[in-house]
Amino acid sequence: MPEFLDIRPLTSAAFAAFGEVIEADPASMRLINGGTTERFHALAAAEAAGEGARVIINLFRGQPRNFPYDVDMMERHPFGSQSFSPVSGRPFLVVVSEDESGRPGRPQVFLARGDQGVNYRRNVWHHPLMALGEVSDFLVVDRDGAGNNLEEFFFETPYIIKEPAL
C-alpha cells in the first residue's frame, strides 16, 4: 500500500537538521550603504570540500511537477552544500530525509514560500528541485570541482505527495 507524505510549512526549526532556511530574518539585518540597504547577513554557509573545489552560483529553471507525485529517489552531495533560492517568487516543495545507515529514511516534505530558500548541508538526502504551478527559476549556490559529488538512492516503493494547497 502506498505511503502518502504530509506537507508541512517550511520553518527554520523544522528544517534545522537538514540545513538552513534562507529568508529575511530581522535578527540578522543590518543597515549598509548609508542606511539605504538592509543586509540580512550570513543566512547560510556554503561548503565546498576537496582539492581545487570552489563555490559557484548557478541559475536552475525548474519545470512544474504533476501531482500526485511519486518520490522514488533521493540524492545527496558528499563534498558540498547546495542552496536553492527562488528568483521567480513562486512556492516550491522541499523533500529531505535523515540518513539511516547510508540510505535515506522516510522523506519529509516542506512547502517553501516564494520568499524562502533552503541550504542543504553536505550529505543531506534531498529530492531534486520541485517547482510548483509553472516554470520557475532558482539561484543555486553549490560546489564545483573534481570528485563525484552526487550519490543517488532509489526506493523500492515510492512515497506519494498529494497536490499541495497553495
From Swiss-Prot:
Its EC number is 4.3.2.3. Belongs to the ureidoglycolate lyase family. This is Ureidoglycolate lyase. It catalyses: (S)-ureidoglycolate = urea + glyoxylate. Catalyzes the catabolism of the allantoin degradation intermediate (S)-ureidoglycolate, generating urea and glyoxylate. Involved in the utilization of allantoin as nitrogen source. Pathway: Nitrogen metabolism; (S)-allantoin degradation. Gene3D superfamilies: Ureidoglycolate hydrolase. PANTHER family: UREIDOGLYCOLATE HYDROLASE (PTHR21221), UREIDOGLYCOLATE LYASE (PTHR21221:SF1). Transmembrane segments: none annotated. It comes from Rhizobium leguminosarum bv. trifolii (strain WSM2304). CDD domains: cupin_UAH. Coiled coil: none annotated. HAMAP family: Ureidogly_lyase. GO terms for biological process: allantoin catabolic process; purine nucleobase catabolic process. It is an enzyme of class 4 (lyase). It holds the Pfam family Ureidogly_lyase. Keywords: Lyase, Purine metabolism. GO terms for molecular function: ureidoglycolate hydrolase activity; ureidoglycolate lyase activity. InterPro entries: RmlC_Cupin_sf, UAH_cupin, Ureidogly_lyase, Ureidogly_lyase_bac, Ureidoglycolate_lyase_dom_sf. Homodimer. Its cofactor is Ni(2+).
